[in-house]
Amino acid sequence: MLYPICIEKVNDGYVVSVPDVPGCFSAGDTLSEAMLNAKEAISFHIEGMLEDDEELPKSNPIEQYINQPEYKDFIVTVVDVDLTHLMGKAEKINITVPALLLHRIDQFIATHPEYKNRSNFLSQLATNRLLSA
């Protein structure tokens, strides 16, 4: 799931806010560290929301924040947060897909290691679609 983050440079590093996840903040000494910490903060924050039976926040397009006056001096970007591990125990299902589509999925997975396998790919796409709806 892609979440927009707004990064502010401060004297001793970077502070990150996550506008689509109220109350979620992070920081880092370097820009890279701040972005990695933001991914972890979002995951932990959403895990807590699930434990409290709260509705999951929807992710808005990054364009919604780029031209906002309150983020004028911020770096606005997105981080990809895998939320599938928070969805509970995996259940095996049997699906039917056209051969060409399956071939294209396999080709895509081969060049995108963040998708571990077909199941992970389909789970992440379904999660992203349902949380963006």
Swiss-Prot record:
Pfam families for the chain: HicB_lk_antitox (PF15919)
InterPro entries (UniProt xref): HicB-like (IPR031807), TA_system_antitoxin (IPR051404), TTHA1013/TTHA0281-like (IPR035069)
PANTHER family membership: ANTITOXIN HICB, UPF0150 PROTEIN SSL0259
Family according to the record: To E.coli ydcQ.
UniProt-recorded name of the protein: Uncharacterized 14.9 kDa protein in rep-hol intergenic region
